[in-house]
Regions:
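Loop-to-transmembrane helix entry/capping segments in MFS-fold secondary transporters
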Residues: 1, 107-108, 174-175, 200-218, ...
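C-terminal ends and interior cores of transmembrane alpha-helices
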Residues: 146-169
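Glycine-rich segments within core transmembrane alpha-helices of 12-TM secondary carriers
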Residues: 1-17, 33-36, 114-118, 214-230
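Loop-to-transmembrane helix entry
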Residues: 27, 101-122, 143, 171, ...
Length: 268
């Protein structure tokens, strides 16, 4: 459901931006906030859980469970590793749009390129899960971790190709970005489902839900670092073109723009 929502939401970004300009992106945020609020109301008033065991924990119990998770070296190591994975995933929104628009031109469609990720996940997750069903969760996640650097290298390679030669009608930067996103989506199908499975298996009986909640500590960490680092990297390697007196000066300043993806390849 998450990936279906991710796909459908990004589909309307490009036409909205073309119709309303950057003002359309602000309107889209209002729309998203409104729909999220309606979903919250729907859950509050209409969702009734048939399973109530384990509910009603005190803040003290929750705090003690958090301490247990943070003192488990295996779980903390896994959270840090998965944080690196999601830092790279977040670049679909933190780095990729500006990177593509600045290097491939305003005619590029970064919102549609980002849609490749949920599309790949929806199409392949059942196949990958079936293929890896007899393998351990750690084995499946390890395969995904090996795929992620390939994704970053594909994204970097676009800037090293001749920008005057299109590939399937697309600028090389845009085309290789899509290829990288395909690998990124494939890596996610190996990692995300089995990560939750592994985390739940480490939980004491009856506290699986609580531990699954703490498994999302990686979301907190990856959002902070994943959206903080790109600002520095874009300023250094792929700066805003309007800051330069001429296009030639900007070309010189952004010649190594693909270095950005080397950083994320190392993180992955």
């Amino acid at each position: 459901m998450v990936n279906i929502g991710a796909f459908s939401g990004k589909t309307i970004v490009k036409p909205l931006r073309e119709a309303l300009g950057n003002e359309g992106l602000i309107t889209l945020n209002y729309f998203s906030a409104s729909m999220t609020f309606l979903a919250l109301l729907a859950i509050w008033f209409f969702y009734k859980s048939a399973q109530h065991s384990g509910e009603g924990k005190t803040f003290g119990q929750i705090w003690n469970a958090l301490i247990k998770v943070c003192s488990n070296g295996r779980l903390i190591t896994l959270i840090i590793i998965i944080t690196g994975f999601w830092m790279v995933q977040h670049q679909l929104y933190a780095t990729m749009p500006k990177y593509v628009l600045r290097l491939a031109g305003e005619g590029a469609s970064p919102s549609w390129y980002a849609n490749v990720n949920p599309l790949v996940v929806v199409l392949t997750v059942n196949l990958v899960t079936q293929m890896m069903r007899k393998r351990t969760a750690l084995t499946s996640m390890t395969v995904g971790m090996f795929i992620m650097p390939i994704s970053a290298l594909c994204m970097a390679s676009g800037n090293m190709l001749d920008g005057n030669t299109n590939i399937l009608g697309m600028h090389p930067v845009a085309f290789m970005m899509v290829v990288g996103i395909v690998f990124q989506g494939l890596a996610e199908t190996f990692i995300s489902p089995r990560f939750l499975e592994y985390f739940s298996l480490q939980a004491p009986k009856g506290e699986e839900g609580l531990y699954l909640g703490f498994s999302h500590l990686h979301s907190f960490l990856s959002s902070i670092f994943g959206f903080g680092l790109p600002g520095f990297l874009l300023s250094k390697y792929c700066p805003e073109p309007t800051l330069f007196a001429s296009h030639e000066e900007w070309l010189t300043a952004s010649a190594n723009a693909h270095y950005i993806w080397y950083y994320f390849g190392a993180i992955a």
